[in-house]
Amino acid sequence: MTTTDFDDHERSRWAGRAAAYHGSFAALCAYPAGALLDAAGVEAGVRLVDAGTGPGTVAALACSRGAVVVAVDAEPSMLDLARRHVPAAVSQAALPDLPFTDGCFDAAVANFVINHVGDPAAALTELQRVVRTGGRIAVTIWPYPAPPAQQLWGQIFEAADIERPRTMPKLAADKDFPRTAEGLSCLLRHVGLTDVRCDILTWTHRADPEDWWSGPANGIGTPGLLMERQSPSTIGRIRHQYDRLTVPYRGADGLLALPTAALLASAAVS
């Protein structure tokens, strides 16, 4: 399997955390699922690979459309969760090394996956390899600048006077790309995909405040990495800022209403 230091870091961060993700941020990442499948042309009979399936949200929706689905993920705890939700083949594999023959799928999707790999172009090239000529690939990523829902955690840590770690692995400069509609579109064109389209999806994510807190509190994402390095007293300080800074987002029902956005890009294999 081809990996970079960034890949190794990402996989270590997700190890054993499927339940924590499912109870916190999975609902946020689920929102684009229908649009993602539409962009890839997924309907009854379409042979689809869902790369980085996580808990299987996109794969399960594709199955409900009558697609013939294969779902893969690098993380065993995610696979265990996906197998409970997806009535299709679920196996362990990771971009950019998929165990499939050339052109064996009609479509491929990767929901918030390209932003978690050490070589995004290689990952897209691999998706292109396993999709037949004329098939479509669709991917989502979080944009930069970050939308309010994602900015909120940075504001919380800043208010609590928490410094970001200086040793976190980053993408190599020659592998990175601008997290904008144009940047993502250019990346797809760079690997040889055609008929490239990119839309910005915007929505308001509604979440229970305790669920939204529980993700980082259980090690999910960069906020989770920061949180697990803190003392109990510092965690208390972070929680105080969390409670204070989420007040403007709380509705009458007690839920958070968090404005957010994602980039959805799709392209054809030619």
For each predicted feature, which ranges?
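A short acidic, Gly/Pro-enriched loop at the edge of an enzyme's catalytic core
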Residues: 96-107
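Short, conserved SAM-binding segment of the class I
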Residues: 122-126
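Conserved Class I S-adenosyl-L-methionine
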Residues: 29, 55-57, 175-270
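Conserved class I S-adenosyl-L-methionine
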Residues: 1-46, 57-61, 77-81, 85, ...
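Class I SAM-dependent methyltransferase SAM/SAH-binding core
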Residues: 47-98
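A short SAM/SAH-binding and catalytic strip from SAM-dependent methyltransferases
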Residues: 107-120, 143
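Conserved catalytic/acceptor-binding region of the Class I
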Residues: 121, 132, 136-208, 252
